[in-house]
């Protein structure tokens, strides 16, 4: 077909324009954010899912997911603005930084109660049998220590009085090995690693989710100064998280979630990942508001070991501005 020269030039211009527009759109840079976490278990699965399924990218974010050795390292990363978000429980590390004046706040709550298994050696039949025993933890004041202290408090046990000793072992993969080797007599474990040691003859003294202890089990912490400066970035990040939680809770996505957990947690058997997926599917909160009552419960426990925590008010440690906006926008429906 013949086109006049003017028409040919016009078509050429249109072609160039149509090729430039998608290229410009594709070249739009993603905004980099860093999520840090210390606990190595299924509780962080919502971040793994959001990363692997590109929910962050859908929100224009290049999310880097970084595991750190402990809460102190994570808090230092936030303080230095090397990370923007910290997936964490209400612990001595996170609340300690708040007590010291760092402008941190819980901006979302993913699990709002204590959960996980308190796993013990076969010789331990009841909570009273923990007296005089060694309990494995990751760090004093960290997540596993806090979970353990809340469980002991529930059972009326006091470490000093009952001669219960804490032994710093490592993250949950290492804690599981510590139980198997006999280094410790008991330890808090998430459901995936609990399954691993149960196959070795260890028993679950208590599934802590069944005793309904209020706690900010999994939350997201950020600096208030970051929220003030970049509220849109925080909003987009929490939108991706909310979508991940909803995906996690949909039974139709079970196999996809299991595969993601197996990859990130390097689990040896599918059953271990299934245990984590099933637990988090019911424990994750679709309406991702932080729990003031759960934070208050931790402040109470921490005040026993350090008076600096007694001055904290739980209401001052949460910032709901982003999740309230998401709720108004219908994100949690």
Where are these regions (language model features)?
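Bacterial N-terminal signal peptides
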Residues: 11-22
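Conserved C-terminal helix/tail region of periplasmic/extracytoplasmic solute-binding proteins
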Residues: 299-333
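Short, glycine-/small- and polar/acidic-enriched structural segments
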Residues: 27-171, 175-181, 185-191, 205-208, ...
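Secondary-structure end/capping motifs
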Residues: 228-310
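Predominant activation on well-ordered alpha-helical scaffold segments within soluble catalytic domains
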Residues: 21, 48, 95, 149, ...
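Pocket-lining segment of extracytoplasmic ligand-binding domains
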Residues: 92, 173-265
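Bacterial N-terminal signal peptides that target proteins for export
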Residues: 2-12
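Short amphipathic alpha-helical segments at helix boundaries and their inter-helical linkers
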Residues: 83, 87, 280-294, 325-331
């Amino acid at each position: 077909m013949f086109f006049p020269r003017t028409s040919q030039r016009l078509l050429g211009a249109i072609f160039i324009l149509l090729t430039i527009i998608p290229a410009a759109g594709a070249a739009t840079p993603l905004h980099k954010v860093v999520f840090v976490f210390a606990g190595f278990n299924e509780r962080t699965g919502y971040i793994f899912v959001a990363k692997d399924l590109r929910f962050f990218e859908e929100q224009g974010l290049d999310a880097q997911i970084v595991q750190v050795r402990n809460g102190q390292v994570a808090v230092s990363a936030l303080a230095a603005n090397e990370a923007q978000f910290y997936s964490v429980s209400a612990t001595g590390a996170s609340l300690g930084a708040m007590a010291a004046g760092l402008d941190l706040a819980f901006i979302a709550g993913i699990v709002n109660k204590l959960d996980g298994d308190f796993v013990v050696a076969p010789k331990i039949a009841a909570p009273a049998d923990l007296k005089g025993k060694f309990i494995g933890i990751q760090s004093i004041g960290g997540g596993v220590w806090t979970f353990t202290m809340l469980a002991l408090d529930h059972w009326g046990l006091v470490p000093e009085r009952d001669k219960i000793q804490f032994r710093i072992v490592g993250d949950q993969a290492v804690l599981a090995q510590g139980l198997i080797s006999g280094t410790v007599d008991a330890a808090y474990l998430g459901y995936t690693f609990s399954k691993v040691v149960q196959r070795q003859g260890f028993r679950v003294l208590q599934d802590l989710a069944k005793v309904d202890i209020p706690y900010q089990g999994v939350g997201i912490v950020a600096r208030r100064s970051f929220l003030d400066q970049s509220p849109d970035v925080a909003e987009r990040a929490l939108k991706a998280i909310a979508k991940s939680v909803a995906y996690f809770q949909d039974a139709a996505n079970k196999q996809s979630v299991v595969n993601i957990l197996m990859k990130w947690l390097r689990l040896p058997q599918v059953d271990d990942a299934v245990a984590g997926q099933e637990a988090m599917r019911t424990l994750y909160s679709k309406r991702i508001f932080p729990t003031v009552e759960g934070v208050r419960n931790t402040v109470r426990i921490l005040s026993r070991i350090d008076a600096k925590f007694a001055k904290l008010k739980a209401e001052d440690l949460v910032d709901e501005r982003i999740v309230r906006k998401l709720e108004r926008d219908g994100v949690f429906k």
